[in-house]
Amino acid sequence: MKLLTKKFKTIWWRIKSVVARYYYGNPSKKLKIVGVTGTNGKTTTVTILYKITTALGYKAGLISTVENIIVAEKIPATMTTPDSVSLTKLFAEMVSKGCEYVFMEVSSHALDQGRVNGVNFVGGIFTNLTHDHLDYHKNFENYFLAKKRFFQMLPLSAFALSNADDSYGEKILEGIKARKFFYGFPARNAFSTPASNASRNDAGWADAGGKNNSSNSSGREPDFSEKIETKLLGDFNAYNALAIFSASKLLGFREEKVKEILKNIEPPRGRFEYFTSDSGVLAIVDYAHTPDALENVLRTANGIKKENTKIISVFGCGGDRDPYKRPVMGKIGVINSDIAIFTSDNPRGENPDAIIEQMKINLSQEDLQKVKTISNRREAIKEAVKLAQNGDIILVAGKGHEDYQIIKGVKSHFDDMEELKRALA
C-alpha cells in the first residue's frame, strides 16, 4: 500500500511540475541555473556564488535554506528547495526582474519528489555525502541515488563539478551526459591537481578527461595553478571555496575579480558565524546538524583554540528525524570538546530528554564526565557562558540561521546568536 501511495505521489508531483512549467512559460530556460547538492556546504556555496555574481554586476537569484533572493529582494525560505509550483513561480519572477543567473540548493527530498524535474540547469555541483535524512530515505544507498539523480538529469552542455576527495565524488558522476570536472586536494586524492585554495596551498581542480599522461600522480596536467585567500575558516570551507572558484571559472567569470571578492566575503548567516565578547570569549554559531558537519566545525574550533583554553559545545539532535545519528553526534561532540552540553534542537513531538539519552548511548563513564545535559536550550547556552573564561570558545551548533524552536508542535521564536549575545553581554 505504501509503495502504491509513493508511486501515486510521484506521478502527481511530476504532473504539477509539467503544469507549472506550461503555465509560467518554462522560465528556467531563460535563466542560467546552477544547482548545488550534497549533505553539507550547499548554503555557503550558493550564497557566495550569488554574492560574487552580483558583485560582478550581473542580476542574479538565490534559492537556499536561509533565504530566497530575487536581485536584492529577500523572500523568506520555507524549505531548502521549494515545491515545483513555487519554484517555477520564483523562476518566473526572476525572469521578470531581469535575472541572468540563479544559484540554488537542490535537496535529496526535492530530487526524490521530482521538484526540479524539467529545470534547465547549466551546471551542477556536488559537495559531499555523509549521514543524513535516513529517516526519509530509509538507507544510505537510496540517499546516494537521490543525489545522483540530479547529475543524471544534466544535459550534455552542462558542467558537473564534483568533490574528488569525497568517497562518492567520482561515483556520483558515473554514466552522466554532462561535462565532468573535479576539485580537491592532491595530497588526498589522485584526481586533484594543484590550483586554488582557501586555507591551504595544495588545492585544485581537473577536467575528468585530463589533458595528457604527464608525470604527476593523477596522470593529468593541471588546468590552472593559483592561490585563493578567504576569511572563511576551516578545511570544509576550503572545499567550499574551491567549488565556488571552480564554478566561477566554468561560468566564464573574470578570475582575478572573483579572487578579490572571495578574499573579503563574509560567511552566510549561521554558517560558522562568530564574534568575540568583551570578556574575551569567542562565540560561534553554526548550522552543523549532521555528524560530519559537527566534527568539521569542532575540528576548526580546535585549530584556532589557544593553549590552556577550553572548547564548550552546545548541541542537540532534531526530534522526529533520523535517530541513528544521535549517538554518533554525541560521541563526536565529546571527543572534540572539553565540555559538551547536550540540549534540545527542535524536539518536535518527541521527549527532549529521551533524545538526549540516545545521544549518550556510545559514551563511556570517562566521556560522561565531560557532558552536561540541559534540555532547555536557553539555559544550556547560559550554562556554557557561565563556564567560559577569557580565551575559551563556545560553539552552539545545529540551528544556525534558524530563528525558532519547535516543541510539542508549537513553533516559538528562538535565535542562537541572539541568546549568545544576550548571555555574554
Task: List each language-model region with its residue ranges.
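Short, conserved phosphate/pyrophosphate- and ester-handling motifs at nucleotide-, phospho-/glycolipid
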Residues: 43, 240, 286-290
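Phosphate-binding loop of NTP-binding sites
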Residues: 2-164, 168-177, 242-251, 305
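ATP-dependent carboxylate-amine ligase
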Residues: 2-11, 188-190, 196-198, 202-205, ...
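Short, small-residue-rich loop/turn micro-motifs
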Residues: 62-67, 184-185, 398-400
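Residue-level detection of beta-strand-connecting loop/turn positions
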Residues: 57, 71-73, 225, 280, ...
